[in-house]
Amino acid sequence: LGHPKALAWLKDKVSGMIGAIGVDIYRHDFNLYPLHYWRRGEAPDRQGINEIRYIMGLYDFFDALTADHSHLLIDSCASGGRRLDFEMQRRSLALWRSDLCWEPTAEQCMTYALSLWMPLHGVGSISLQPYDFRSGMGSTFSLALDYQNPSIWSGATRLLKEYQSVRHFF
């Protein structure tokens, strides 16, 4: 996104698809570690310029999408927290805040720290163990279980009712 021609192509392509298909929510994921790519070709005294250009291009990309489609909601995957800056939050939501998920202590720490700055974020649970489940609670919540297994439903129903009773605190 730091290359103007590539950015222009991407804006046209994605915006065209959003319009043609009638997309209401666009999810942008970032599942890679980009530092290696950003540092390639940078002089030692110019470290960071590729990253800056990429981030500015990403902001421009999101701005173009919302300018073309005023109804569009953008969900930007936080990329392990690397996209949780104020400018990104102005342009999108981070419904999935980090791929460091399913570890109760980490989830509690992120919920506490991010809730001071971001009203909407979360992860969820892959467990029906009450401690694990509660640690994943937040303003957004997903539950990744084997839904084909009938034995999960009573526990899942009980814990989801508990979540519904406290979600207004998030």
Predicted regions and their residues:
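Active-site-proximal substrate-binding groove within the catalytic cores of carbohydrate-active enzymes
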Residues: 19, 32, 58-170
